[in-house]
């Protein structure tokens, strides 16, 4: 049994970093699994539901914008990854990671360059993390519509930067990422 851990969402100006870890059955036949960035939002949503239904186990980890600012994006990403892995049951025998080795994890790890395009399990973890984060940003948009998080997902689009300059940072903005915009 293997697990895939995928970091996601390091570049946005707002919102948490989200990591996914997925254990797929050995005989998994989920079609169209690929790098989440190469899939349409509709296809990611469809695949998310299939993954959640068929996976042996799924773990999701988060690191808040405040935590990102406190310890830096890389360390916050590692924390989210460790949280995601810790939620898996059963515990995996090996981790296939998208190009990284996660510190403080005792499970053997295999970093794979462009892993989300080369491993269906890493692709599944990528999709779970991206859909989870995108859904969270849509919820934030309901509370803070002026930033248009539903459309920009916290990334630095022109409309997002204009809103940031007009309204200032929200509680979910990453202060260390927006210093040259405010």
Regions found by a protein language model. Give the residues of each.
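RNase H-like, Mg2+-dependent phosphodiesterase core
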Residues: 1-182
